[in-house]
Amino acid sequence: MKFIIKLFPEITIKSQSVRLRFIKILTTNIRNVLKHLEDDTLAIVRHWDHIELRTKDGNLGPEICDALTRIPGIHHILEVEDRSYSDMHNIFEQTLEAYRETLVGKTFCVRVKRRGKHEFSSGDVERYVGGGLNQHIESAKVNLTRPQVTVNLEVDQDKLILVKARHEGLGGFPIGTQEDVLSLISGGFDSGVSSYMLMRRGCRVHYCFFNLGGSAHEIGVKQVAHYLWNRFGSSHRVRFIAIDFEPVVGEILEKVEDGQMGVVLKRMMVRAASQVAERYGVQALVTGEALGQVSSQTLTNLRLIDNASDTLILRPLISHDKEHIINLARQIGTEDFAKTMPEYCGVISKSPTVKAVKAKIEEEESHFDFSILDRVVSEAKNVDIREIAQQSREQVVEVETVAELADTDVLLDIRAPDEQEEKPLKLDQVEVRSLPFYKLSSQFADLDQSKTYLLYCDRGVMSRLQALYLREQGYTNVKVYRP
């Protein structure tokens, strides 16, 4: 079985030295991706305008073809069969044998590519073979503009190459031809698509996740990152860095004015990610921000977010609308992950600014204890992406959700103080206590552990994440309250 791998057109217009480097990297990437097949008969040979792949194990054909369609740098893949030929009539006879059943009742055209010196041209072969097929298959008709079947042939010196199938590739540049980037991934639609777009452009994409509460969300995001890597970037080893950002969020909620919280949080994330990028020699950050999508993504606010660090920030989705982003997520397979990913509800301003003022932002940040940011970055967890598959299979501790309260239960309102003031929680015959989520990890141990505590927040997301975290710490007296 033989495959001819055609290069992405942008590769073919590079200078000779760059083109050779790109082809060499693409060949190495293909070998790395197919290494798990353990096929001793697999042979990959690079040429000036294509890469040739052969295997004697025909059963591996579908798996090889599927893998090739997901490797950046490949324009299309031709599944071919090599034959020898004697003359133009012999080419027609072999084509008729191969395509007779396929062309019954169909419109068709013949397309020929030729390399070498011959007594005939490509057009001569197209006319001769096409006319012969039209005469010998009565129900078939020639259609040169919109054929149902295109008969693709290649004549290479003394070989006839019958193209049995054509499969579209991913396009783009081979991973490793551009420098590394660090994607700020949240598991939603935007960050997954932006990560994919940079992989397709030839970057090795590492992942940085800011954990805003509990392991359930982290495991979900790890699964998204592993899926993207396994599907499009498994030719290279990458890092997954998880940063516990809950202490930073708590400091923002206590020290920063409501309207400035969103921009300040993004600036803190950029600062933290920049430190991580510098640590690992990564050249740029990648975010899924789109212009005007939310309040922090206006031009004014994006400029202020950029000013928090000297590191280059790439935003491949900046001009894309949400519908287009969701369609892209559907195409690459991350839509289902994104739809079920919990959205963090801890830092939601009642009146977020859409045109932040630099002096005001800097004044608010002057109240922030930056030693907290330095600490969470220094404690960041660095995981090899290949280890995530095993970690993701581990059971997540289940937390019971209740809709009714017992007299002995204590309800913990874990919302931020301003949310509690705006929508006070009043329940008869049940003790209600206020303990913002960002204080749970440090103050829950001080509570009476003989009682059962029900955690409450508006959406039920933060309460579940915090309950999971407490269960992992060994506390069994926690549940989630969802009326």
Curated annotation (Swiss-Prot):
It is found in: Cytoplasm. Its main location: cytoplasm. It is an enzyme of class 2 (transferase). The keyword Transferase applies. Residues 62-166 form the THUMP domain. Keywords: ATP-binding, Cytoplasm, Disulfide bond, Nucleotide-binding, Redox-active center, RNA-binding, Thiamine biosynthesis, Transferase, tRNA-binding. The gene is thiI. The keyword ATP-binding applies. Residues 405-483 form the Rhodanese domain. One of its GO terms (biological process) is tRNA 4-thiouridine biosynthesis. PROSITE patterns: RHODANESE_3, THUMP. GO terms for cellular component: cytosol. SUPFAM superfamilies: Adenine nucleotide alpha hydrolases-like, Rhodanese/Cell cycle control phosphatase, THUMP domain-like. GO terms for molecular function: ATP binding; CCA tRNA nucleotidyltransferase activity; tRNA binding; tRNA-uracil-4 sulfurtransferase activity. Pathway: Cofactor biosynthesis; thiamine diphosphate biosynthesis. This is tRNA sulfurtransferase.
